[in-house]
Design a protein with these regions (language model features):
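Post-signal-peptide N-terminal segment of Sec-exported extracytoplasmic proteins
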Residues: 16-59
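Beta-strand-dominated lipid-handling architectures at cellular/organellar boundaries
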Residues: 16-20, 39-41, 59-61, 66-68, ...
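Mature, soluble, non-transmembrane domains
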Residues: 6, 78-167
Length: 167
């Protein structure tokens, strides 16, 4: 027997959540594997990316329509709908707001559960490839110029806000 296996998408409740895991970034020029710690409280996101040996590569914060990328003292600010201007990513419009809902298994505005494990928005294609009891565990976000793969190691769901801390 062969065929497709349907994944049941269990959405993470809105509010305060975080996860830790691995992020694979692939472009035509490079391939990197980073550790990721993503903290979300309502509309505020804080993402810490670390490279080999746990060295912090970047902190990304999205709050009130602004995206702030801190790469070890080099801080760049974007409006949420701005295109990225970093080397290698010129003109690339990343769906930051939508992504914070998609990784939880929700539609773009967070109100409804995704009806499929796949979402297409512009040139971006998001897919949940594995789910667990706590929520999505493996996901991909693809664009003709870049492919991101996310593997969640641990979800933490909370009803109350807590400061960013190590999982």
């Amino acid at each position: 027997l062969s065929g497709c296996v349907a994944h049941r998408i269990e959405p993470i409740p809105p509010g305060v959540w975080r996860f830790s895991g691995k992020l694979s970034l692939q472009t035509s020029e490079e391939s990197r594997i980073l550790s990721i710690d993503w903290y979300q409280a309502g509309e505020v996101s804080e993402i810490v990316l670390k490279g080999p040996l746990g060295v912090k590569v970047a902190t990304i914060r999205a709050d009130q329509g602004e995206l702030i990328v801190d790469r070890g003292g080099q801080v760049v600010r974007y409006r949420d709908d701005d295109v990225l201007m970093q080397t290698g990513f010129e003109g690339l419009k990343l769906p930051w707001k939508s992504l914070s809902y998609w990784v939880r298994g929700h539609t773009e505005h967070g109100g409804q559960q995704l009806t499929s494990s796949e979402v297409k928005r512009g040139d971006w294609y998001f897919r949940i490839t594995e789910t667990g009891i706590e929520g999505p565990l493996a996901m991909t976000l693809e664009h003709p110029r870049v492919k991101l793969r996310l593997r969640v190691r641990q979800w933490v769901i909370s009803a109350e806000e807590t400061p960013l801390q190590k999982i």
